[in-house]
Amino acid sequence: MRPHPFLYLAVLFGLGLAVYPLCADSRRAGVSTLIWLSLWAAPAGTLAARTGLLGWVVPVAWLLALTPAIGGRLPGLVGVRFEWAYAGLALGGLFGVGWGVGRARLRLSMTLAAALLLLGLLLAALPSLGGLGGPAPWSPALSACFLDISPVSLVLECAGVDWMRHPAVYTPAGADSIDPLLRLPWAGSWAGPCTLLLGCLASWIGIQYGARSSA
């Protein structure tokens, strides 16, 4: 028996926000929630693709659920208001990439979602090697490159968080040695909309590929 689509999507929505109540330190709950959402958005999109376009209610619901809290009341993100909209667009784009992947191969959606989650974790851990390689394991140029391709950097910087100076990155990833000529934070005003456009393009390609595969 297949689950009701709204119940299924509610589970995907809830998993995206599950980190917030689990944080022992409320001061870190805001950033921790956005970190997890940046990793979960693409896999959630892949799984939501099973419900068709209805699956897009998940990122919209995330945006609606967090907007009141982000407006100065979410611990760890005080003052991050208008920028949250750009982070929401970035999350929508990551979700769209996953949704397109899922539509392209519906039968493999579970496997593909797991692969996207592992890929996101890898990209997020690369700048500091997950803390296993000692402080600053890469050259400043490589660290800058790895920060650029991390979904965590994208979403948090779109939200207005100074991620390069966050304790999780500043010393462990050697961000203190990265010259501004090597890397500047993502500007949410263009990075958020561009990520959403990329997600929409990936979704369209996934629909076309899936239709051809089933024909």
For each feature predicted by the language model, list its residue ranges.
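A structural motif at transmembrane helix-loop-helix junctions in multipass membrane proteins
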Residues: 93-136
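Alpha-helical transmembrane segments
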Residues: 2-19, 56-67, 199
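Alpha-helical transmembrane segments of multi-pass membrane transporters/translocases
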Residues: 9-17, 169-212
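Secretory targeting signals
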Residues: 60-106
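Alpha-helical transmembrane segments of polytopic membrane proteins
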Residues: 4-7, 26-41, 80-92, 110-120, ...
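Juxtamembrane "helix-exit" motif on the non-cytosolic side of transmembrane helices
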Residues: 18-27, 67-79, 103, 125-136
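Canonical alpha-helical transmembrane segments
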Residues: 37-55, 94-103
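Terminal transmembrane helical anchor/hairpin motif
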Residues: 126-193
